[in-house]
Amino acid sequence: MKEDLLEIFKHFGVRNQRDKLCEEFRELQDEIFCTFELGIDRENLLNEGVDVISLILQFLFDYGYDTKEIIDELQTRIKRTVFRKNNGYYDKKI
């Protein structure tokens, strides 16, 4: 996994990293807005989300986080989200 992210880094270069991540955030944001307005396009939403996640992981690697740290934190967040979903946390009116 780390090798794949390093390839992405080499492809985009240091100067373009920020611009590429911002572009991917905008594409994900557009896809989220489309989901609310037009209904979900699961494939596009997944693709844009994964693009953003992979670039964020690249930044974490660049700043010295190792794979275990990142995966441990992701697992913690996923477990919390699943727990909240199963216990109706997201069903509450805000």
Q: Where are each of the predicted segments found?
A:
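Flexible "arm" and connector segments at domain edges
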Residues: 1-94
